[in-house]
Every structure is written in C-alpha cells, then in structure tokens.
Amino acid sequence: MKKILVIHNKYRETGGEDIAVSNEIKLLEQKFKVKVLYFDNNISNLFLQSFYFATNRNKKSINLLKQLIDDFNPDIVYVHNTWFKASLGIFELLKNKNIKVILKLHNFRYFCTKSYFSKNHVLVDNVCEACGYKGSKRILNKYFNNSIAKSLLISRYGVKYFQI
C-alpha cells in the first residue's frame, strides 16, 4: 500500500481550505496509508518567527518534517498550504530526499504577489483579478495587512513559491 504524507499549514480560523484538506485526507485514507503533518501560525517567539518568515526557511519545521519522513518513509508528499510556518524550506528537503511531491494550489494569493508592488497590480477598475484587492495605482501598494514591509515579505514568498 502506497504511503502519502499530507502537509498543511492551518489557518488561524478554520475556513474552506482547511475543510477541503480534511475531506481529502478522509478520501485518501480509503486507498492509502496516510500521515498528516499540520502546522499552525501560533507565534511563541516573535523574533525567531520573524527570522524564519523573512528567510522562507523554518528550521524547526524542516527538522520535524525530516523526522517524520525518516519514520514514515512516504512514497508521495502532498503539500497544501505552506504559509508561513511550514515554510518554503520544506521543498529543498523533499527534493534532497528524492520524494515525489504534489503541490495543490487552493487560491491565487501568490499569483498576485508577482505584480502587486507595481502600479499594474490593479487594473483600470482598481481591482486585482487574482486577489480582489481594491487599491490605487501606486508604485507601492500596502497589499498585506496595510503594511509595505509585510507586503514586501509576502511578495518575496510568492516569487519563491513560483520557483518551486
């Protein structure tokens, strides 16, 4: 029986993506041996979490995943949300372990990060077709939490996400 490791970073408030992941896990368990690695974005050390977020690598998450891979030895890793505690650093580990990866894109949040720092982020009607953001045609939009600094970090995350 094939083994699948599901990775999902839960949202602070349960929403559609979390429910979809839960439903898919139930479906997969009917045909495969499944383990689930959940992450959450509770912050215990603000400085350390900020560092992990800025570097797109969470050493604690990577080590947790490495241990689970060594114990479970999955054939496939099915990745849902990595924002932000799971981190993009998990993909380097998965590549080095030569494990097949399925990456599910639930929404287009990262697509719009490719452009939201430009005045082209919002079109003629001032609404981004990818995220629904309504704003002005400025050079820098405060897209994420009304903060240029946070917007810059998520933009960097989005660019790296599409390099995977």
Over which residues does each language-model region extend?
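Catalytic cores of nucleotide-sugar-dependent glycosyltransferases that transfer UDP/GDP/TDP-activated
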Residues: M1-I164
